[in-house]
From Swiss-Prot:
Keyword match DNA-binding: yes
Biological function: SASP are bound to spore DNA. They are double-stranded DNA-binding proteins that cause DNA to change to an a-like conformation. They protect the DNA backbone from chemical and enzymatic cleavage and are thus involved in dormant spore's high resistance to UV light.
Gene3D superfamilies referenced in this protein's UniProt entry, alphabetically: Small, acid-soluble spore protein, alpha/beta type-like
Organism encoding this protein: Bacillus subtilis (strain 168)
GO biological process: DNA topological change; sporulation resulting in formation of a cellular spore
Residues the record marks as site: Cleavage: 22-23
Highest taxon listed in the record's lineage: Bacteria
Keyword Oxidoreductase attributed: no
Pfam families: SASP
Name this polypeptide is given: Small, acid-soluble spore protein D
Note: SASP are degraded in the first minutes of spore germination and provide amino acids for both new protein synthesis and metabolism.
Protein backbone atom coordinates (compact mmCIF):
# COMPACT_ATOMS: atom_id res chain seq x y z
CA UNK A 1 0.00 0.00 0.00
CA UNK A 2 1.29 3.43 -0.92
CA UNK A 3 2.15 5.84 1.86
CA UNK A 4 -0.09 8.89 2.11
CA UNK A 5 2.27 10.81 4.34
CA UNK A 6 3.32 14.08 2.77
CA UNK A 7 6.49 15.82 3.86
CA UNK A 8 5.99 19.46 4.80
CA UNK A 9 9.55 20.41 3.87
CA UNK A 10 10.56 19.31 0.37
CA UNK A 11 13.84 17.40 0.16
CA UNK A 12 13.91 16.35 3.81
CA UNK A 13 13.34 12.66 3.07
CA UNK A 14 17.06 11.79 3.02
CA UNK A 15 17.62 13.48 6.40
CA UNK A 16 14.65 11.61 7.91
CA UNK A 17 15.96 8.30 6.56
CA UNK A 18 19.36 9.00 8.12
CA UNK A 19 17.69 9.96 11.41
CA UNK A 20 15.67 6.72 11.30
CA UNK A 21 18.83 4.65 10.79
CA UNK A 22 20.58 6.42 13.70
CA UNK A 23 17.67 5.76 16.07
CA UNK A 24 17.41 2.15 14.91
CA UNK A 25 21.12 1.65 15.54
CA UNK A 26 20.80 3.12 19.05
CA UNK A 27 17.94 0.70 19.76
CA UNK A 28 19.75 -2.24 18.17
CA UNK A 29 16.99 -2.71 15.58
CA UNK A 30 17.66 -3.90 12.04
CA UNK A 31 14.94 -2.17 10.04
CA UNK A 32 13.23 -4.21 7.39
CA UNK A 33 10.34 -6.47 6.55
CA UNK A 34 11.82 -9.34 8.58
CA UNK A 35 11.78 -7.26 11.79
CA UNK A 36 8.71 -7.45 14.02
CA UNK A 37 6.33 -4.51 13.86
CA UNK A 38 6.88 -3.71 17.54
CA UNK A 39 10.61 -3.10 16.95
CA UNK A 40 10.03 -1.04 13.81
CA UNK A 41 7.31 0.91 15.63
CA UNK A 42 9.61 1.69 18.54
CA UNK A 43 11.96 3.44 16.11
CA UNK A 44 9.15 5.55 14.65
CA UNK A 45 7.86 6.39 18.11
CA UNK A 46 11.27 7.52 19.29
CA UNK A 47 11.73 9.61 16.14
CA UNK A 48 8.42 11.34 16.81
CA UNK A 49 9.32 11.95 20.45
CA UNK A 50 12.67 13.53 19.52
CA UNK A 51 11.20 15.65 16.73
CA UNK A 52 8.49 16.99 19.06
CA UNK A 53 11.10 17.80 21.72
CA UNK A 54 13.20 19.62 19.12
CA UNK A 55 10.20 21.63 17.89
CA UNK A 56 9.23 22.55 21.46
CA UNK A 57 12.77 23.72 22.16
CA UNK A 58 12.75 25.87 19.04
CA UNK A 59 9.38 27.38 19.97
CA UNK A 60 10.66 28.16 23.45
CA UNK A 61 13.76 29.82 22.00
CA UNK A 62 16.18 27.21 23.32
CA UNK A 63 18.33 24.85 21.32
CA UNK A 64 19.87 21.50 22.13
Amino acid sequence: MASRNKLVVPGVEQALDQFKLEVAQEFGVNLGSDTVARANGSVGGEMTKRLVQQAQSQLNGTTK
